[in-house]
Amino acid sequence: MLTALVIDDEPFAREELTDLLSETGDIDVIGDAANAIVGLKKINELKPDVVFLDIQMPQVTGIELLGMMDPDTMPYVVFVTAYDQYAIQAFEDNAFDYLLKPVDPERLRKTVKRLSKAASHSALSQHIASLAPETLDQIPCIGHNRIVIMATESVECAYSDISGVHVRSASQTASTQLTLKVLEEKTSLVRCHRQYLISIKAISEIKLLENGLAEIITKTGFEVPVSRRYLKLLKEMLGLSH
């Protein structure tokens, strides 16, 4: 039996879809979320086999959430959409499934059957990844009991520690459910250390230390370590040959 997560900002839609999925006997709904930010957190925590994802949600859409998922651990995704026939055709052309609101029980059963018979997770993931945005314009974060949507261009660095991944701008630091790998691949942040990414435009100076190590000082005075492995690449990106 496949496990599923339902993400939709409409409570009735979540409840109705959860009931319909339970009635199929092939899906165990292990959670739901009212927005994409909480949804991403639950995807990382619960690791469902399938995510039924609404497209039109406030702040972060379903399409944007798709681009925030780690491609190495991405679940099956089925869009739940009220889009018109032209948009639906576009999803079909990409060999990607969808459910049209209001969800038709028979159509849902066909979707579940198709998922159950999927030849491999990797094959479907390739279709999912092909629809994901190549870059992220915003990063959903949680800080001080509030949801923060941080513009990617305002971020000076991102780093991970025992408590998770954190994103820092000139004005604030907040936690995100996105991995450093996703941030590295889909933003302009550059790897400078196993646990740190840096924005080139945020660099004020680089202090060269002993043993081939270095330390970046950002324009706001934040200190970011640079490992030997990434120092040469960083110099090249700054136009320094030595």
From Swiss-Prot:
PANTHER family: REGULATOR OF RPOS, TRANSCRIPTIONAL REGULATORY PROTEIN BTSR. It comes from Vibrio vulnificus (strain CMCP6). The keyword Phosphoprotein applies. This is Uncharacterized response regulatory protein VV1_0503. Keywords: DNA-binding, Phosphoprotein, Transcription, Transcription regulation, Two-component regulatory system. GO terms for cellular component: cytosol; protein-DNA complex. SUPFAM superfamilies: CheY-like. One of its GO terms (molecular function) is phosphorelay response regulator activity. The modification 4-aspartylphosphate is found at residue 54. CDD domains: REC_LytTR_AlgR-like.
